[in-house]
């Protein structure tokens, strides 16, 4: 693996069973030295092909490499240049020359083919989850988790977890929680994560007297218990800038699903692939419509049996479709390493 450096990388690298080379540059950019560096390392280890992630901008070195290359597509990094004159032509050339395309979902797969102007040899390998780490909590574990996070044991908890940026839709969730508070005094919207939108969201919650608690950034080791102590998980992601900004997939939906928690999602990008509408949760076509969000939350909070069924289906889907061992096999088949 050739990648960029970060603080503490040496400790991580030492614990991995494969070779990791790190550049001096904080960001990998497509320039002639990078081409030479990749070619030299590939020759040294006897590689048959190169996998480049992300496709933009780093993937632009692909056509200059001496070996075949595969590209990994996530979403926005293809959507924006795919709609800009000049950039689209360069991107299309890079995509068409690739041996294979690995897309994180149907949305980036479609964006790649739109940019290329033709079908591509694409395999969808979505974001995955460790189902042993992210698992449903027992009753006692759920009680302990709520106590750990300072959440009342009898609260109806709607959890949101993500970077706090406008397209994640937490403002709509806050507005919905404020309405629901009138009829559901035990409701609590818990928002975890950090980002530039936090100040605005806190002001909105105060103005509306909404039942919201901001946890800030939560350590990775605490995430399974945070998901597991919620009744519903939500991220009302929405499109912005005429569709140039969308949700690529939504790993948080899959993590919540693996914990057996039903999800309420906004229909943006790949979110509707991560959440099976009517099966593992609810996908809202207009995630800025507050009443639609209120209705979705009410549907799940009013029906314990429905919530339990969706939670069970969520867990099963996480095991069958999103577990790392399942996706590793799919990726290996796509790359031809099992041939």
Residues of each region from the PLM?
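Short His-centered aromatic/hydrophobic patch
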Residues: 52-58
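N-terminal strand-loop element at the rim of the active site
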Residues: 1-29, 108
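Conserved donor-binding/catalytic core segment of Leloir-type glycosyltransferases
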Residues: 102, 152-168, 174-178
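Nucleotide-activated donor-binding/catalytic signature segment of Leloir-type glycosyltransferases, i.e.
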Residues: 199-224, 232
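Acidic donor-binding loop of glycosyltransferase active sites
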Residues: 99, 228-246, 261
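A short helix/loop element that forms part of the nucleotide-sugar donor recognition site in Leloir-type
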Residues: 135-151
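A short, active-site helix/loop in glycosyltransferases that binds the activated sugar's phosphate group
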Residues: 97-124, 129-136
